């Protein structure tokens, strides 16, 4: 099987980001975004999806975290879709419901080339370790856009904002693990392409 590894970078007046992913990795990561809680979430995503992620970002955090969070998602999504190649044989779909103490989150994903994100969650804390909680939804919307994926994410239960967000990222990780797994030699679409 061809190695499913890809890199992508993006440099603007607001951010300078580079990312490399290995879809058939072991969940190792080296992530440095300047946003401590985002680093923690992406490390969890890597570990639980089994996707190796190397990502470095220098952003205009003196303004706020918006550009960094959005652009990190855009670059990560592009690296993942590039690593998928023609998507031949992948599971395409994945889903997970993940608990973290009192929090319960779910994610369903379709890597079929149709970008759409539905997000349902409300957080009580406005910021956690540099990450504006309003940016959590924007992260997933931006990721789905460049990954050409249909994402449905929801927090079903929860009070602790940290637990709720971490359960969301872990549910994405386990859904991705299923969706990127090579299961056959066929393309899972009646169109013959995804």
UniProtKB/Swiss-Prot annotation:
Main location: cytoplasm
Catalyzed reaction equations: D-erythro-1-(imidazol-4-yl)glycerol 3-phosphate = 3-(imidazol-4-yl)-2-oxopropyl phosphate + H2O
Cellular component terms per the entry's GO annotation: cytoplasm
Single biological process term from Gene Ontology: L-histidine biosynthetic process
Domain of life: Bacteria
Enzyme Commission code: 4.2.1.19
GO molecular function: imidazoleglycerol-phosphate dehydratase activity
Record-linked CDD domains: IGPD
Keyword terms: Amino-acid biosynthesis, Cytoplasm, Histidine biosynthesis, Lyase
Subcellular location per the Swiss-Prot or TrEMBL entry: Cytoplasm
Pathway(s) of this molecule: Amino-acid biosynthesis; L-histidine biosynthesis; L-histidine from 5-phospho-alpha-D-ribose 1-diphosphate: step 6/9
InterPro entries xrefs: IGPD_sf, ImidazoleglycerolP_deHydtase, ImidazoleglycerP_deHydtase_CS, Ribosomal_Su5_D2-typ_SF
Pfam families (UniProt xref): IGPD (PF00475)
Family: Belongs to the imidazoleglycerol-phosphate dehydratase family.
Protein name, per record: Imidazoleglycerol-phosphate dehydratase
UniProt lineage: Bacteria, Pseudomonadati, Chlorobiota, Chlorobiia, Chlorobiales
The gene coding this protein: hisB
